[in-house]
């Protein structure tokens, strides 16, 4: 059984723009799958359809054999609890502490009123501190999040997903706004938790060299369709040119070695 299955998935926006066209994909547990393609190719739409931040128009998406497309109420909340999300612009409460932001990953496990009052049990705080230690910012736990650098804020996002105890992490252009050194640190963190914890990573990346260096699998999208799906080791520059529909520009390669 695949951990994520896209079955005949299509997405048409109200303005009639076609975001996804009949997508059929299976993502296995423990994969580090990278989605690549030009801006507007459907990368974010595909990624965000997994946890239903974007609802699809037709088809069905399954998480560990259960349809998230048809899930509602508590069943949907329980499925989403298993899927962490990392955004390009961090999506943190900037005036809150690092620890409080990481603890927000536990919201799906408790009544809303407890979370509003900040009544997190001791076990949750231990999980949050462990997650911060894993991404090497435990010493920042009591600082305000907006006092940290962009790279450190993205690591808070990763720690939040870990504290959530997600088996799947979706990362939507998580390093697009970071410098090369910080990019390497964040990507190394994602690879480490993928390899050590077996967490499945599905990530959108703009840069070709990052996709090849960190991904185990490349999924190429063009105009909402999958035009390449194979091992990262076999994704040549010619294949990337086919995905992009043109020659790859130097500023789209960006390695981190």
UniProtKB/Swiss-Prot annotation:
Molecular function GO terms recorded: ABC-type phosphonate transporter activity; ATP binding; ATP hydrolysis activity
EC number(s) from the headed UniProt entry: 7.3.2.2
Pfam families per record: ABC_tran
Topological relation to the membrane, as annotated: Peripheral membrane protein
Positions that bind ATP: 37-44
Cited SMART domains: AAA
SUPFAM superfamilies: P-loop containing nucleoside triphosphate hydrolases
Catalyses which reaction(s): phosphonate(out) + ATP + H2O = phosphonate(in) + ADP + phosphate + H(+)
Gene3D superfamilies: P-loop containing nucleotide triphosphate hydrolases
Superkingdom of source: Bacteria
ABC transporter domain sequence ranges: 4-248
Entry function: Part of the ABC transporter complex PhnCDE involved in phosphonates import. Responsible for energy coupling to the transport system.
Protein's UniProt name: Phosphonates import ATP-binding protein PhnC
Organism this protein belongs to: Staphylococcus aureus (strain bovine RF122 / ET3-1)
């Amino acid at each position: 059984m695949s951990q994520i299955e896209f079955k005949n998935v299509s997405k048409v926006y109200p303005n009639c723009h076609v975001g996804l066209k009949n997508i059929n994909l299976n993502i296995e547990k423990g994969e580090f799958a990278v989605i690549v393609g030009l801006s507007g190719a459907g990368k974010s739409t595909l990624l965000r359809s997994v946890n239903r931040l974007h609802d699809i128009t037709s088809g069905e998406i399954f998480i560990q054999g259960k349809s998230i497309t048809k899930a509602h109420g508590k069943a949907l909340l329980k499925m989403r609890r298993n899927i962490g999300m990392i955004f390009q612009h961090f999506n943190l409460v900037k005036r809150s502490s690092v620890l409080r932001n990481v603890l927000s990953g536990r919201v799906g496990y408790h009544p809303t009123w407890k979370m509003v009052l900040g009544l997190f049990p001791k076990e949750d705080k231990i999980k949050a501190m462990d997650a911060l230690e894993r991404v090497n910012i435990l010493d920042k736990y009591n600082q305000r999040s907006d006092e940290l650098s962009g790279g450190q804020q993205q690591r808070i996002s990763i720690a939040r997903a870990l504290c959530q105890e997600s088996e799947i992490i979706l990362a939507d252009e998580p390093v697009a706004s970071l410098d090369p050194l910080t990019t390497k640190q964040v990507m190394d963190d994602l690879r480490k938790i993928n390899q050590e914890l077996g967490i499945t990573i599905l990530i959108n990346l703009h840069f070709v060299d990052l996709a090849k260096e960190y991904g185990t699998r490349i999924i190429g999208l063009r105009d909402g369709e999958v035009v390449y799906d194979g091992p990262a080791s076999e994704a040549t520059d010619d294949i990337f040119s086919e995905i992009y529909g043109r020659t790859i520009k130097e500023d789209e390669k960006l390695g981190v070695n």
